Amino acid sequence: MAVAAPGQLNLDESPSWGSRSVDCFEKLEQIGEGTYGQVYMARETETQEIVALKKIRMDNEREGFPITAIREIKILKKLHHQNVIQLKEIVTSPGPERDEQGKPIHGNKYKGSIYMVFEYMDHDLTGLADRPGMRFTVPQIKCYMKQLLTGLHYCHINQVLHRDIKGSNLLIDNEGNLKLADFGLARSFSNDHNGNLTNRVITLWYRPPELLLGSTKYGPAVDMWSVGCIFAELLNGKPILPGKNEPEQLSKIFDVCGTPDESNWPGVTKMPWYNNFKPPRQLKRRVKEYFKHFDRLALDLLEKMLTLDPAQRISAQDALDAEYFWSDPLPCDPKSLPKYESSHEFQTKKKRQQMRQADEAAKRQKTQHPQPHGRLPPIQQTGQPHPQIRPGQPMNNPHAPMAAGPGHHYAKPRGPGGSSRYPQGGNQGGGYPNRGGQGGGGSYGNAPYPQQGRGPPPPYPGSGMAGTGGPRGGVGGGYGGGSNYPQQGGPYGPSGPGRGSNYPQQGGSRNQQQYGNWQ
C-alpha cells in the first residue's frame, strides 16, 4: 500500500469498490439514523466479520449522488490512521430494496441503494457516557483525549478539517481504541485560508465563536474549540455550553469566556455579525471560576482550547505536549480499559423514548380507568381489633413495610518544535442529550439571526444543523452525520506529535480523582 508523506494525502490507494452487493452482508441491528439514511451493524456472510453499514439516502437527491457522501468517501479513502475510522468498501443493492411484504421501499422500483462499509466500533462516546452509573476515571479521560488529539492532528497535517466533532462522532471499541468518524462535513483546506468556507457547520453546542460571528475564512482552530468542549464535558459530566439557538450559544460562550474585543481578539469587530451580538456590557473571562473544581493542569489546557481568538487557540500537536498528559495519573493503556455492552447514542435514545412512552401509556391507562374509591371501614369499638390489621402491626401504619433496594501505546517521540498557535493570517475574518442548564443569555436583543455567509440557514429555529432535530445534531451514531448541507468546495508513521508513550507500567499507581459526577 502506498504511503502518504506528512502534509499529503494518499492518492495511490484505489480499490475496486462497488463491485460487491449488499447481499454479502446480513443486517443485525440498526445503530444509527440521520438525514443521510440508516446505519446497521451487519455480518459478512462469508467471513463472519462484524461491520457497520451506512446506507446513503438517494430518494431526495435530484442531481445524483449526494455531495456530502462524495466528499466523505474521497477523504476517507486517503486517510489511514489508527484513530480515524476505516472505510472498508462501497457496496450496492442492484435493485429496489423491499419491505417485509416484498414491496419496493422506494417509489422508483428501479432505484437501488449504496452502502458505505466501515469497521464496526462497539460504542460512541455519547452512548458510553449515557450508560447508567458510568464513571470515567482520570486516566481513562486522558487516554480518550490523547487518542482524539492524535487522530485530529493527523487530519490537520493532511489539510483536512473535520467540522463536526462531538461525542456521537467519536467511536470507541472494546479494546479502548477511539476513532474519529463521520466525515460528511469534512473538507480539505489550504494553509493560506484564502477560500470562503461555510460557517453553517459544527453542531451548535460545539461550534466556535468565529463561526457564530459569521466567519467564512477559518482553519484547524475550529476543530480545537470543539475538542475543548468535549474535554470539559468529560471532566464536568455534562455539556458546558448547551445553547438552544445561535444567539443563546454566543451568550453562553461570552458568559464563560468573556466578551471579545480588539484587545483580546484583534479584528473581531470586523466580523460580519459582531454588531448584531455585541453584549450590552463587558463580561470578564471566567473559565477558571466556572471550572475551579478541575485539576490545575486540566484547567490550564482547557483555557488554551477555549481561547476566543482562533489565532491564539492551541493546536492539536501542542495540546498533546501539554503537561496534563505527562503528570500523574498518566493516561492508561487503552487495552486496560473495561469492556462494556454495546452503547450507541441511537440505542440509548431509543431506550429512553420507549421508557417515556411506557410511562405515558401507564398514566393514560390510570386516567381512563381510575380505581374505585373503597368505603371507609366501620367504626370499631374500643379494644376491638381492626379487621385490616395483622397482629403485631402498628395501628398508625397499616401497610406492611417494603424492602428498600441497593443502590495502544503510541510510542511517539517528542514532536518537532513549533508555535503553539495557529498563524495569524486567515483567522481574523474569521447530543449528548441536554443534561445541562436551560439556556440563559437573552441579552442580545430581539433581532433575527443574520443570514449572511455561505450555506443555508437551519430550517428550524434553535436547531444546530439542518434536519438534525436539536443542537446535538440528531442521532447519527458516529458513522454518519446529522446534516446534509451542501458544502463549498500515507499512513501515519511512528513519528508524530507528543513526547512518546506515557502510559504507566504494570504495577504503577493509578490515582483515582473525581470531577463533578465523574470519577
From Swiss-Prot:
Biased composition (Polar residues): 505-519
Modified residues (Phosphotyrosine): Y36
One matching Pfam family: Pkinase
Keyword line: ATP-binding, Kinase, Nucleotide-binding, Phosphoprotein, Serine/threonine-protein kinase, Transferase
Listed GO biological process terms: positive regulation of transcription elongation by RNA polymerase II
Name under which the protein is recorded: Cyclin-dependent kinase C-1
Region spans: Disordered: 336-519
Main enzyme class: transferase
Active-site residues, Swiss-Prot/TrEMBL: D164
Biased composition regions of type Basic and acidic residues, renumbered to the chain: 336-348
E.C. numbers: 2.7.11.22, 2.7.11.23
Protein source organism: Oryza sativa subsp. japonica (Rice)
Gene3D superfamilies according to UniProt: Phosphorylase Kinase, domain 1, Transferase(Phosphotransferase) domain 1
Domain Protein kinase, residue spans: 25-325
